[in-house]
């Protein structure tokens, strides 16, 4: 692409023939880590006529058009869209001598955003936010980033998860209540033992529950002690602050076996039933067992 093209790219190569002092100053001023992920500029001489020139490669943080970039480099640069990898361009621009080098190239098989993504994970940024911020890096290294979070960042639960149970007929607004419950992000637990996609969300929803988890597992989920839950390929800490369970049946009818369901009831913090004004706490006399103690 000629330098007068109206295209916008992040990766460019440039040549400045017979560079002046002002050209050197412009290149040095522009090639910094605020503008470039990686930049390398070499001093060369033409093979035929021996013309001195600067040969450079830029991997920019933001797309730039040729005209604007030419101005930033002093106004005399010939520009073209870069081809090949960062490493290929690094080798080409440093074949005679290297005048300037800033940042690090994107190595083959490695995302240049990986260190930043790892730093955000270590700082406690939720893994879903990391995925949104660095989608390509997450696609390539998501499992490793999640493992990093599990090993370094995760904390075990040492609080009582608040358990809210809603009992009502179909179509009475239980799922709507759970959907509108204030939370930055919720995790909807699917039927079965797997917790795929759970990444420490504060609110977990078990919608239309009727006993599809082992009873002892449910008791542990509703408790206050450290708990690791299983996803396909590993385990992670269960750290929900709130658990919302909706059902058409009362908890005492969730399991057919002879369990002591009072152990479940006492872990329930709020037991809500449908009233003319919406869902509200059930009167104590309506409950077969005492809750929240």
Swiss-Prot record:
Divalent metal cations, possibly Mg(2+) or Mn(2+). Keywords: ATP-binding, Covalent protein-DNA linkage, DNA replication, DNA-binding, Endonuclease, Helicase, Host nucleus, Hydrolase, Metal-binding, Multifunctional enzyme, Nuclease, Nucleotide-binding, Nucleotidyltransferase, Transferase. Residues 6-105 form the CRESS-DNA virus Rep endonuclease domain. The active site is at residue 92. A motif (RCR-2) lies at residues 53-55. PROSITE patterns: CRESS_DNA_REP (PS52020). Gene3D superfamilies: 3.40.1310.20, P-loop containing nucleotide triphosphate hydrolases. Its cofactor is Mg(2+); Mn(2+). Pfam families: RNA_helicase, Viral_Rep. ATP binds at residues 168-175. InterPro entries: CRESS_DNA_REP (IPR049912), Helicase_SF3_ssDNA/RNA_vir (IPR000605), P-loop_NTPase (IPR027417). A motif (Nuclear localization signal) lies at residues 3-13, 62-83. It catalyses: ATP + H2O = ADP + phosphate + H(+). One of its GO terms (molecular function) is nucleotidyltransferase activity. Its EC number is 2.7.7.-, 3.1.21.-, 3.6.1.-. A motif (RCR-3) lies at residues 92-95. One of its GO terms (biological process) is DNA replication. It comes from the Viruses. One of its GO terms (cellular component) is host cell nucleus. Interacts with the capsid protein; this interaction relocates Rep into the nucleus. Essential for the replication of viral ssDNA. The closed circular ssDNA genome is first converted to a superhelical dsDNA. Rep and/or Rep' binds a specific hairpin at the genome origin of replication. Introduces an endonucleolytic nick within the conserved sequence 5'-AGTATTAC-3' in the intergenic region of the genome, thereby initiating the rolling circle replication (RCR). Following cleavage, binds covalently to the 5'-phosphate of DNA as a tyrosyl ester. The cleavage gives rise to a free 3'-OH that serves as a primer for the cellular DNA polymerase. This is Replication-associated protein. The gene is rep.
